[in-house]
Regions:
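A short, glycine/small-residue-rich beta-strand->loop->alpha-helix junction that serves as a flexible
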Residues: 32-38
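Conserved beta-alpha-beta core of the PfkB/ribokinase-like small-molecule kinase fold
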Residues: 127, 131-165
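A short, N-terminal amphipathic alpha-helix
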Residues: 39-53
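Acidic-glycine-rich active-site phosphate/pyrophosphate-binding loop
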Residues: 12-24
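Conserved small/polar residues in nucleotide/adenosyl-binding loops
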Residues: 1-7, 163-167
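Glycine-rich beta-alpha junction loops
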Residues: 9-11, 61
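Conserved N-terminal subdomain of the carbohydrate kinase-like
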Residues: 23-27, 34, 49-132
Length: 167
């Protein structure tokens, strides 16, 4: 594939409210939205929609969120050969509160994302070796990030690490 992206896949649960609650406070919110998310999954979808040939490497749970995510990847024409399904952990979930100014508070339960291992990366070696670029983030175990980066570098493949300080 043209691009190999490895990182997180979450289900985002978003509640909009006038303001963010203070610690220990319950407030009434407005609209509730449930979307597919995770930095890696968002980038894979964006690249595929722009016409990129994308292989995504991640772990999801064997649950309704994982099933819906896998279905979405197929609709977006993302290669899911290396999307691992683990029964030991649920799919990742992010609870997001957004106020009327667009400020947010996010809590992530990594779930299956936290099980992406160097063994998973080794299994995905054919996709990494065929890619022209490997795009990664830091929402999965660092050992799998460094392992994938070294694997790509060894074959002269461009590595792009997208870092956010709040992850």
């Amino acid at each position: 594939s043209e691009m190999c992206i490895r990182d997180s896949s979450n289900t985002d649960m978003v509640i909009k409210s006038d303001r963010l609650p203070k610690p220990g406070e319950t407030i009434l919110g407005g609209n509730f939205l449930m979307n597919h998310g995770g930095k890696g999954a968002n980038q894979a979808v964006a690249a595929a929609r722009l016409g990129g040939d994308v292989t995504f490497i991640c772990k999801i749970g064997n649950d309704i969120f994982g099933n819906e995510t896998l279905e979405m990847f197929h609709k977006e024409k993302i290669d899911t050969t290396y999307v691992g399904i683990t029964p030991q952990e649920p799919s990742g979930v992010a609870l997001i509160n957004v106020d009327k100014k667009g400020e947010n508070c996010i809590v992530v339960a990594s779930g299956a994302n936290g099980t992406l291992s160097t063994d998973d990366i080794q299994h995905a070696e054919p996709a990494i070796k065929q890619a022209s670029i490997v795009i990664m983030q830091l929402e999965t175990p660092i050992e799998s990030v460094t392992y994938a980066a070294k694997m790509a570098k060894k074959d002269g493949i461009t590595v792009c690490l997208l870092y956010t300080s709040d992850a």
